[in-house]
Amino acid sequence: MTSKGSQEEYDYLYKIVLIGDSGVGKSNLLSRFTRNEFSLETKSTIGVEFATRTIQTEGKTIKAQVWDTAGQERYRAITSAYYRGAVGALLVYDIAKQATYKSVERWILELRENADRNIEIMLVGNKSDLRHLREVSTDEAKEFSEKHKLTFIETSALDSSNVELAFQNILTQIYHIMSRPSHSTGPQTTIDSNTETIILPTTSEPPAAKSGCC
């Protein structure tokens, strides 16, 4: 299928949101995944921005629309529009800052209040390159993820570790869910943004066999 106003072809369009406290590296995760760029001078995001990237999974072309917003409290008024239409969320904390990890439960509550109840959530421990400054153990975060039924991964936007894998995994998980019969026979899903309304194509093909991912 071809997106309107673009020659780029894709089978599915999924909106993914990045959430978490300010300074955990959300903007650099976005730029590393979509443009393979990293900036040490990144300032706190003001308002909202999004970027897109197309990937292949199980023979399908998936276009990810990844949204980024500041985690600071004064910007929380935008949350309802920010979450609207999102089918996945990367909840990011800084492994070298315990306070950002302690905020994770609050972000989960905000997700539950504003996002679709079936949104796929991945907990992301970012800045894994700062292992010498680690304040949050991998085992603790894994245990938390299992308790809250989240997937979990540690990444580094600085050295690219697991950034590609994190997005690939959550997009594949969403594809498995969205290609089930209960999703493929219903009305088309739309993604609302401030700039355009995007139709999420449905599929008449049978769901792909589920494959494992971390």
Curated annotation (Swiss-Prot):
SUPFAM superfamilies, A to Z: P-loop containing nucleoside triphosphate hydrolases (SSF52540)
Membrane association type: Lipid-anchor
Ranges spanned by the short sequence motif Effector region, renumbered to the chain: 42-50
Residues linked to a lipid group, S-geranylgeranyl cysteine type: C213, C214
Gene Ontology cellular component list: contractile vacuolar membrane; contractile vacuole; Golgi apparatus; lipid droplet; membrane raft; pathogen-containing vacuole; phagocytic vesicle; recycling endosome
InterPro entries per the UniProt record, alphabetical: P-loop_NTPase (IPR027417), Rab_GTPases_membrane_traffic (IPR050209), Small_GTP-bd (IPR005225), Small_GTPase (IPR001806)
Localization terms from the record: Contractile vacuole membrane
Pfam families (alphabetical): Ras (PF00071)
Entry keywords, A to Z: GTP-binding, Lipoprotein, Membrane, Nucleotide-binding, Prenylation, Protein transport, Transport, Vacuole
GO-annotated biological processes: cellular hypotonic response; contractile vacuole organization; exocytosis; osmosensory signaling pathway; protein localization to vacuolar membrane; protein transport; Rab protein signal transduction; small GTPase-mediated signal transduction
GO molecular function: GTP binding; GTPase activating protein binding; GTPase activity; nucleotide binding
Residues that, per the record, bind GTP: 20-28, 39-45, 68-72, 126-129, 156-158
Gene3D superfamilies registered for this protein in UniProt: P-loop containing nucleotide triphosphate hydrolases (3.40.50.300)
Protein family: Belongs to the small GTPase superfamily. Rab family.
NCBIfam families, sorted: small_GTP
Function statement: Required for normal contractile vacuole structure and function. Cells expressing a dominant negative rab11A exhibit a more extensive contractile vacuole network and enlarged contractile vacuole bladders. These cells exhibit a functional defect in osmotic regulation where cells immersed in water become rounded and detach from the surface, and contain swollen contractile vacuoles.
UniProt protein name: Ras-related protein Rab-11A
Lineage: Eukaryota, Amoebozoa, Evosea, Eumycetozoa, Dictyostelia
